[in-house]
A protein has these predicted regions:
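A short beta-strand micro-motif
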Residues: 2-8
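Acidic, low-complexity, intrinsically disordered interaction modules
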Residues: 11-70
Length: 70
């Protein structure tokens, strides 16, 4: 599973890609935030830097190409 750690200013949040659906442009991600694990489906977007999904109230871009195989 591909994993990415994001620092939100207070703590690290871990994202693990569960699946990517190119047909519906969605990515399913297991999010570990402060000890709680949630599986969330995000819309995939694309810009000049690649495919990403938006996370949090500030809609931070989390790029799929930043994930590393765990």
């Amino acid at each position: 599973m591909a994993e990415y750690q994001h620092f939100d200013g207070e703590t690290f949040i871990t994202f693990d890609i569960v699946s990517v659906n190119e047909r519906t442009n969605e990515v399913q991600v297991a999010v570990t935030n402060r000890g709680k694990i949630s599986v969330i489906t995000y819309d995939l977007c694309t810009d000049e830097n690649g495919e990403y999904f938006e996370y949090g109230c500030m809609y931070e871009k989390i790029y799929l190409n930043e994930f590393m195989e765990a």
